[in-house]
Amino acid sequence: MKNLLVYVNPRNNFSNENWDNENDLLVKVQIDNSIELGWKPEDIMLVTNFPYEYSGVKSIEVGDENYCSFSCGTPTKINVILDLFDKGLIEDDIYWFHDFDAFQMEEFDVDLESNKIALTNYGITNISKGHNGRWSTGSVFFGNRTKDVFDLIKWAVYKYEKNEEVALLALTRHNKHKILDRIDRLNITYNFATRRRNIVEQHKITELPIKVIHFHPFDKRPVFYLREGQDNIGVCLHGKNPMDKPLVTERLAKTFKRHGIA
């Protein structure tokens, strides 16, 4: 399996208008965390549009044209994955793409056919039941025969000028090109997000222990249903949640602390 991280930015570095240079810390957390969990540096694919190297992981550089200028740039991941296909860098293996704020906590091995992608829904939100079933692309597994699936998603992204989650929802709602035959829905354990989620109810449907937790440690907004001040760090690292316990493992918490995130 390959561990895929993507960061393409018009500034050609790890800064952006929301988080300044904090993503430069997160990439180090991601690489250290992955190596601690047994990933070899050569199996960690960090794709950027600028040179970067850390702890034996050297970035694969792609062009600035992969950046998507709308929807906060999130469809960029689709463009980059397709670029990797075009460059012959997607080989006979399973690939795990995940956002910079989706952190693996346990070792896993996903059984997936080479012509399929696998991802979770949104879990149990405090937004609406309609959001619960929406696809979440923050953690996606895919095989080496899925280029046509990503081509379809890209087509829908640019047709509707919406992000890749909305595009995928549009495709699957009407099962265009029988796309549902190419998608496996995973348990929320592979993408346990916290903000705007009913953590207690979501935890009940999670295959424990949580394998991937999805939260941005630098997002200081209150988690939707909690009181002011109970942000992602408080909820996930310090147990300031209705379950009264941390959601991250002690090992991952130590990795965060080593990088000044606590």
Q: What are the language-model segments listed below?
A:
Residues 1-73, 86-91, 144, 237-244, ...:
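N-terminal anchoring/stem segment of glycosyltransferases
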Residues 25-28, 75-79, 162-170:
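A structural signal for well-ordered alpha-helical segments within the folded catalytic domains
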Residues 43-44, 95, 183:
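Hydrophobic/aromatic residues located in beta-strands of well-ordered beta-sheets
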Residues 46-53, 100-108, 218:
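Short, polar loop motifs at secondary-structure junctions
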Residues 59-61, 75-126, 134:
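GT-A fold catalytic core of metal-dependent nucleotide-sugar glycosyltransferases
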Residues 80, 117, 139-141, 185, ...:
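Conserved hydrophobic/aromatic beta-strand scaffold that supports enzyme active sites
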Residues 105-170:
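Conserved catalytic core of nucleotide-sugar-dependent glycosyltransferases
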Residues 144-255, 259-260:
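Catalytic core and acceptor-binding pocket of nucleotide-sugar-dependent glycosyltransferases
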